[in-house]
Amino acid sequence: MATKAAFARMNGLGNQIIVADMRGRADSITSAAAIRLASDSETAFDQIMAIHDPRTPGTDYYIAIINCDGTQAQACGNGTRCVVQALAAETGRHAFTFETRAGILTATEHDDGLISVDMGTPRFDWQDIPLAQAVADTRKIELQVDPADAPVLHSPSIASMGNPHAVFWVDKDVWSYELDKFGPLLENHPIFPERANISIAHVTSSDTIDLRTWERGAGLTRACGSAACAAAVSAARTGRTGRKVTVNVPGGPLLIEWRDDDHVMMTGPAEWEFSGTFDPATGEWSRDTQGLQGSGNADRGAA
């Protein structure tokens, strides 16, 4: 019988994350285990960040990302910050290189506790997102929420940050829209063969964006780091903002910079909640006082 694995329940601006220590193990977290953990109010999460031994030379760890519906995700910026905080507390290191399904990324914990993640380069070609049909210009595609003569949401910008995003621009408060109603319909629209993350964005100044996101495989979320990046690069690409913006998500602000080398940097906090152990096959778990960060962090607040 396999031994249980350690985990830490954390959050990145309210994006609920489980950081699971799968190093030195041959097994992986099953979909059934993820769904069981997601259904428990104490361990409910948006994503699991499972830390595995490295698969590629030059990287520190491979991170498998699992949504709360048991599906695999390519990227999770908020979850990556949580992984960095957990590993920094354990190892004393502050810079890491990870491999995910979306590729290689680097991340650094700063002296003030904030964490920057290099989210890589955005992609805009319709094949790379991917879309189901050719689109000449992904800055604005034909997609809308009915009624046809006065659509509630329409003409989103499309981008990939290693995962597909649609950003709908609105001219009023993002809370004015029923994202819980429109989100699942748009996520599963036929134009997105791999489904998509759906965001509503309101540009409030040349360097500030308000954002709400329906996250693919997770639903409404208080924060989605890759969506914040997709909104920031799409805003710059369409002339709505400059290349360095604050994106205000329901959980708080993220600083996003689309650098001249085309890389997108995301900076924000992470917060430790509690630790425990769990069975990666079944999802059976228990809380303990020792975990990825040890017993001395039980009252640790936001970094």
Curated annotation (Swiss-Prot):
InterPro entries given in the database record: DAP_epimerase_AS, DAP_epimerase_DapF
Catalytic activity reported: (2S,6S)-2,6-diaminopimelate = meso-2,6-diaminopimelate
Superkingdom classification of source: Bacteria
Region annotation (Disordered) ranges: 278-303
Identification of the protein by name: Diaminopimelate epimerase
PANTHER family from the UniProt entry: DIAMINOPIMELATE EPIMERASE (PTHR31689:SF0), DIAMINOPIMELATE EPIMERASE, CHLOROPLASTIC (PTHR31689)
PROSITE patterns noted in UniProt: DAP_EPIMERASE
Site feature Could be important to modulate the pK values of the two catalytic cysteine residues, where: H165, E215
GO cellular component terms, semicolon-separated: cytosol
Gene3D superfamilies per the UniProt record, alphabetical: Diaminopimelate Epimerase, Chain A, domain 1 (3.10.310.10)
GO terms, molecular function: diaminopimelate epimerase activity
Entry's family note: Belongs to the diaminopimelate epimerase family.
Chain sites annotated for binding substrate: N15, Q47, N67, G77, N78, N163, N197, E215, R216, G225, S226
Residues at the active site: C76 (proton donor), C224 (proton acceptor)
Transmembrane recorded as keyword: no
Subunit and partners: Homodimer.
Keywords, comma-separated and alphabetical: Amino-acid biosynthesis, Cytoplasm, Isomerase, Lysine biosynthesis
An example Gene Ontology biological process: lysine biosynthetic process via diaminopimelate
Species of provenance: Brucella melitensis biotype 1 (strain ATCC 23456 / CCUG 17765 / NCTC 10094 / 16M)
The protein's role, per its UniProt record: Catalyzes the stereoinversion of LL-2,6-diaminopimelate (L,L-DAP) to meso-diaminopimelate (meso-DAP), a precursor of L-lysine and an essential component of the bacterial peptidoglycan.
Pfam families recorded: DAP_epimerase
EC number in record: 5.1.1.7
Location of the protein in the cell: Cytoplasm
